């Protein structure tokens, strides 16, 4: 098979991976009263089956086997963004928050937000520390869980997933995990999802209320969600008597609690003594701020220096992730002035309890967790870096490469979001020689290499060398601002301004904050040139004076004229915009009615009973989920209140869902109301099928009566096959109640649109 054909084939299979369904990893995400189950498969088994056919073709054409490097870059390294806590954890924390005093929780949540804002504004030299859970009250613990638990879980899940990719041996060993991080054993929860069932789990926590939460989560809730649960042991302090006993030690959000550098180093020594000498791992994770990265950087330097000072080979150590080297960190923020840090992001779905005590306008369903971390392995030295193993084009990628843990540890890592430009991609990496490199991968480097560069993400390993490279010097990595004495002010002094030549054009020249017009100066220059031979001294000095003083007067006049012109233009624009806005206000209602009558926007009632059969109510799991949001309104003359009991529900095409509205009569007499509904966008209304609802029916409510109104619906499976629905991810279901009015014959007079 020709090489060009192989290249196109591998590109086709690479794009084909987006068409397969995820099936293995379970992730439960609740939205309101409805819990939806998503299935994901991180191994892309279907893509492997297709790649096996391509490998057979390569073998038959006497070419090496398909590159495992390509397999790694295509599927193994891609991280899932659909991370969320289990439903039972969410319900448990939600129940704790609702039982507590709302005022205290909101106060402590605001205090945490203020501390986070203060941390980002303070310089590194200013003292700052987080409050330890040891001194927290019960409402403070709940406020911390509300603010930090989803973010901390997403960060640790991403770190452990990356650790499993880079160091594949960690999943094969017997796991003895020690979680001494801040919170209710979040590191242990993340390890359950990434690694096989560990042999033993220990959690360090002193707070009595937090210990109770840990017991409930890890002994009562977690065993019901796992086929092979592990009951953890809760400890009051670090088990310093069990040195070299744990294969994985996790400390998240703990370094910011240290008051001094001595306390920080003592804590690191204690953690390091608990790590097993036979390849044990220490995971340190902090918030992705300047202070958090600074602590991670100091801990990294301290532990590496500690291992170098000992002659015992059992205490050898090296960085597993994210650094591909054991040298000095090239990002030096303590001696610089830029907020240039090594941090990463992880997308995740917010838990329902995270939306409590949050204004409605600030509620979101997902967010990103910023974190800085380091993973250090004890007792094993870093494998030698094979500097000749570099990949530059498609031919190198198609070669047979054995992707193993020693190889992955020396690969460069992307430390900033790739800049995807037209025709090329700019990727900044931290390389194995402790330098920052900028790789530029253009289209001319190869279609496969360019495609992989376009699909690369922040935090990925990237072994490709760009066609164009620039390396930062090891002595000065960060850019420093110029000294204040050498910077220019807004209006620089005259000696810094360019000179105004005699033979300039009539166009104005912009220098600093001054506009120079040279029309009059040009006319005077001609007169001076004509008479300069008669009175050379006079005209020479007068000419110089005019260049300085006369031109300034001209520039001032020009500035005033330009200011008045800009002022008049601005007024004209404001008047025109005001008239247009006023006219648009009067024309909005008829224009909207005309638009709805022509396009069908506003929803169409689906009365075809043949589309309500059970065959259409089968979820199509191979399609994306659609967010259905709810809204309730009443007419101005109706003394009712109408609101949805849930804000949103995520459903698949063909999946049935049940929602509830609550209607309340706030008046002192009985009222009969009739509801109508609206679907936005209107083109999706034909696929929105309601099996049962309360619209177009008379609803009588007694004085001060409150009732629940159900809505049972599903989205027709043909929604997924319609190309016009391709970009529709959100559907709004809105109900409006009107007061029912009758004529003398008892017929309903209320107009429903």
Curated annotation (Swiss-Prot):
Keywords: Iron, Iron-sulfur, Membrane, Metal-binding, Mitochondrion, Mitochondrion inner membrane, Transit peptide, Transmembrane, Transmembrane helix
Residues bound to [4Fe-4S] cluster: 323, 329, 342, 430
Mitochondrial intermembrane topological domain residue ranges: 592-753
SUPFAM superfamilies, A to Z: Ctag/Cox11
InterPro entries hit by this protein: CtaG/Cox11_dom_sf, Cyt_c_oxidase_assmbl_CtaG, Ribosomal_Rsm22-like
Positions of the record's site feature: Cleavage: 568-569
Reported modifications of this chain: Specific enzymatic cleavages in vivo by mitochondrial processing peptidase (MPP) yield mature proteins including rsm22-2 and cox11-2.
Transmembrane spans: 571-591
GO biological process entries: mitochondrial cytochrome c oxidase assembly; mitochondrial translation
Any one annotated GO CC term: mitochondrial matrix
MF terms (GO), sorted A to Z: copper ion binding; iron-sulfur cluster binding; methyltransferase activity
Transit peptide residue numbers: 1-39
Pfam families hit by this protein: CtaG_Cox11 (PF04442), Rsm22 (PF09243)
Family: In the N-terminal section; belongs to the methyltransferase superfamily. Rsm22 family. In the C-terminal section; belongs to the COX11/CtaG family.
HAMAP family reported in the protein's UniProt record: CtaG
Protein name (database record): Rsm22-cox11 tandem protein 2, mitochondrial
